[in-house]
Amino acid sequence: MFEFSIAIPAHDRGENGPKWMSELLDSLERQTFQDFEVVVSDQSKNDDIMNVCKDYDFQFTYIKYQGDVPCENINIALNHCEGRIIKPMFSDDIFLKDYALERIQKEYDKLGCKWAFSSDRDWET
């Protein structure tokens, strides 16, 4: 079992879609905390997102979602997650800090919470 599951519901985003997905996966590759899997549920009509994912050496679960209901796409990604902590991210999201997952895990465990949200802002807890 992984500590984190990164759940990514992907869909058509035009010519920017593959670029944004690459930027997201690059930000995951730079993380100091590496005990995670990546779960992509891809609702796009072409193979661009799948081809981007092939360039990375993560533990991947890739699902090609043939439907047209965005909330189902998100649920498919979430339902395939095996990690203790699930971090949903969209294909145009990135981690700004290389220690983001490490920080999320630390705060999550310190607070003993069941839900946590993250931001690029430092909040007092």
Sequence positions of predicted segments:
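Short, well-formed alpha-helical segments that are part of the catalytic scaffolds
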Residues: R13-R30
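Short alpha-helix within the catalytic core of nucleotide-sugar-dependent glycosyltransferases
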Residues: M21, L25-D26, N75, G83, ...
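Active-site acidic short loop of glycosyltransferases
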Residues: D35, F58, C81-R84, L101
